[in-house]
Regions:
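N-terminal secretory/targeting leader peptides
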Residues: 1-207
C-alpha cells in the first residue's frame, strides 16, 4: 500500500555561461545523471554522465559547462564557485521517496491506528514539499545577494523544449506497460490531478 510520495526541490541548470534560450545550449556539455540525457539530446546539448559529487571538478576542469541539479547544489556542492549562472528551466521536482506499508500488517492494525498513519503520511508529503519550495526560494535569494545570475527560462522556450521531447513520457510509460505495470494509466491520472490543481502543461502529451 502506497502511503505517500515525497517531492524534491525543482531541477534547474547551473552553468559557467549565461543563457536563456534553447539554441544557446547547443554543443554545451552538461553534467547529469544518465537517466536525464534524453531531455538534453534533442536540444543538441551534450550529456556528461556524472554523479553530483563530481560536477564541481568537471566544471572546474572544463569537462562540463553546466550541471543539472537543484539550486541548493550551488551551496551544498559549492557549484557557485564554478558556475555564475543558474537557470530555472521549469523541469519541476522529483518524487525522491515513496513510503509503502505492508498490506498484511495494515489489515492487522486497528482502524484508528491506520487512520493516524495515513494522516501523518499525507502531512509529511505536504511538509516536505513546503520545505523544498522554501529552500529553493531561500537559496535563490542568497545567491542573488552574492551576485549569481538566476534566470527563468521563458514560457515559449519551455514550450519549445517540451515539444521536442513530447513523445518521451508516453514511450517510457509504454515500456513499463509491457512489463506489467499500469504506467500509462498512472501517467494519465497524474496529469488529471495536476490539471485539477490548476497546473497547465505546455502541451498535451500523446499517451
Amino acid at each position: 500500500h502506497v502511503l505517500s510520495a515525497m517531492v524534491s526541490e525543482a531541477y534547474g541548470v547551473a552553468t559557467s555561461f549565461d543563457w536563456n534560450s534553447i539554441p544557446e545550449m547547443k554543443g554545451k556539455r552538461i553534467a547529469m545523471a544518465g537517466t536525464n540525457a534524453p531531455l538534453f539530446i534533442p536540444i543538441e546539448a551534450i550529456p556528461v554522465t556524472l554523479g553530483i559529487g563530481d560536477h564541481y571538478q568537471a566544471m572546474q576542469s572544463s569537462l562540463a559547462d553546466g550541471s543539472l541539479f537543484y539550486i541548493s547544489g550551488m551551496e551544498a556542492f559549492k557549484l557557485k564557485e564554478v558556475a555564475e549562472y543558474f537557470n530555472k528551466t521549469g523541469f519541476g521536482s522529483l518524487s525522491t521517496l515513496v513510503a509503502f506499508m505492508n498490506l498484511d500488517t495494515r489489515k492487522r492494525l486497528p482502524k484508528e491506528v491506520v487512520d493516524i498513519i495515513d494522516e501523518v503520511a499525507l502531512e509529511t508529503s505536504w511538509r516536505v514539499a513546503e520545505i523544498s519550495k522554501k529552500r529553493d526560494q531561500d537559496v535563490e535569494a542568497r545567491l542573488l545577494e552574492e551576485g549569481i545570475t538566476v534566470n527563468t527560462l521563458p514560457a515559449e522556450q519551455r514550450a519549445q523544449w517540451a515539444e521536442l521531447i513530447k513523445d518521451l513520457p508516453g514511450k517510457s510509460a509504454q515500456e513499463l506497460d509491457a512489463k506489467g505495470f499500469p504506467a500509462t494509466q498512472v501517467l494519465k491520472t497524474y496529469i488529471k490531478f495536476m490539471n485539477e490543481e490548476g497546473y497547465q502543461f505546455p502541451l498535451d502529451y500523446p499517451l
